[in-house]
């Protein structure tokens, strides 16, 4: 342990460790790093994946220090993970960090273990989703839970995006309740709130071959099987079987390793004319402005940012009732909650909106009202800073005894 290093006038050194900057976890991490006081903190970003050009430009413009460490593979691999662990230990020792703040599963396990071995005084883990039961392998899930229990003994705090996610971890006996803090994700919502005012709807529709008769359904997220796109495709297929002449367009916004599989599956269901893969888009709010409803079929989420963004645009949402979803979607108030994997129920809820445009407007308005003022980036940064401050004070007090 690096005793008393915190009790000085120099800047507090923090390392944020994450697989890559993409999706909600990465966005939260960047907002936090950007918002923290640079006169008080010296912050480094440690990650494995290569950066997209827009993210790289953003990091350079904000003068964020970052280290890219390989091999940072998503899947568990003993040799690669051992090498990564050793590299992190060396990095933390050389950097003399006061706080290591990890995010996501593998960086959370290896990063905290490395921080412990390197003698980092304060170790924090960010919970962006319930990652304990997501693998198809029961053995891997059991190992993750076992490791999380062990590592919890030297984890000083858990910062969760959702009360429900915290509760899941506590139910498995991971850490003590006093170590858990819930901080809502911070988001830039103005561009979503004003999306329908600031774009030429007709021009955007032309880009994707959407006409005025089409009922437009949207989905935003990584194109990976855990996002459950195939359930949504199956629901669209059923609707077209029930209503053969129903004009439907499904906008799938995002990129991911399973894009080819999903594209192939859409073709197998004869949905080529209905499903539009837009690829990665920086202007998500413009595409959301074209949608009648938003559908999220993820099988795991922490607190889905896209549902908040859709609500800010004024779009009602249908979502599988998992983890933090119910903290945003109130059933039959600003959207509908559906039993996970239940295609029949999903189909029925989509049809319910198709048959009732007034309900779309009502739920859309309720959604906008619900999210207003609750997802402040400034609030997220201030609460994170307070946790850092309290842990530092606590550590100094213990070292002085």
List PLM regions with ranges:
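Aromatic "clamp/platform" in nucleotide-sugar-dependent glycosyltransferases that forms part
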Residues: 280, 299
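Short hydrophobic beta-strand element within catalytic cores of glycosyltransferases
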Residues: 316-319, 329
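Conserved acidic donor-binding segment of nucleotide-sugar-dependent glycosyltransferases
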Residues: 331-332, 336-343, 352-357
């Amino acid at each position: 342990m690096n005793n008393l290093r915190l009790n000085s006038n120099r800047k507090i050194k923090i390392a944020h460790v994450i697989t890559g900057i993409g999706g909600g976890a990465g966005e939260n991490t960047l907002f936090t790093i950007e918002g923290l006081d640079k006169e008080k903190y010296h912050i480094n970003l440690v990650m494995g994946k290569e950066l997209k050009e827009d993210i790289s430009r953003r990091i350079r413009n904000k003068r964020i220090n970052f280290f890219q460490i390989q091999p940072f593979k998503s899947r568990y691999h003993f040799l690669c993970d051992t090498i990564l662990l050793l590299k992190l230990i060396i990095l933390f020792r050389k950097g003399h960090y006061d706080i290591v703040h990890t995010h996501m599963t593998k960086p959370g396990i290896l990063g905290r273990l490395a921080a412990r071995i390197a003698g980092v005084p304060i170790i924090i883990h960010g919970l962006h989703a319930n990652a304990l039961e997501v693998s198809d392998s029961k053995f891997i899930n059991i190992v993750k839970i076992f490791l999380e229990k062990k590592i919890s003994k030297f984890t000083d705090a858990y910062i969760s995006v959702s009360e429900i996610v915290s509760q899941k971890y506590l139910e498995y006996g991971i850490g003590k309740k006093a170590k858990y803090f819930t901080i809502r994700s911070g988001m830039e919502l103005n561009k979503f709130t004003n999306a329908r005012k600031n774009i030429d709807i007709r021009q955007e529709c032309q880009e994707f071959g959407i006409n005025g008769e089409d009922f437009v359904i949207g989905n935003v997220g990584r194109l990976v099987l855990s996002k459950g796109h195939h359930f949504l495709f199956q629901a669209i297929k059923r609707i077209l079987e029930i209503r053969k002449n129903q004009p439907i367009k499904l906008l799938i916004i995002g990129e991911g390793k399973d894009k080819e599989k999903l594209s192939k599956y859409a073709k197998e269901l004869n949905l080529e004319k209905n499903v539009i893969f837009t690829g990665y888009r920086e202007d998500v709010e413009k595409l959301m402005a074209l949608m009648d409803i938003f559908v999220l079929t993820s099988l795991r989420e922490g607190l889905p940012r896209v549902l908040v963004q859709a609500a800010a645009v004024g779009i009602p949402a249908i979502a599988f009732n998992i983890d933090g979803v119910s903290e945003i979607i109130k059933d039959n108030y600003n959207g509908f909650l559906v039993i996970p994997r239940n295609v029949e129920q999903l189909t029925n809820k989509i049809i319910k909106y198709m048959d009732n445009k007034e309900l779309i407007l009502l739920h859309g308005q309720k959604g906008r009202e619900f999210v207003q003022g609750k997802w402040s980036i400034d609030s997220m940064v201030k609460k994170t800073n307070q946790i850092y401050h309290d842990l530092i004070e606590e550590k100094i007090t213990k070292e002085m005894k």
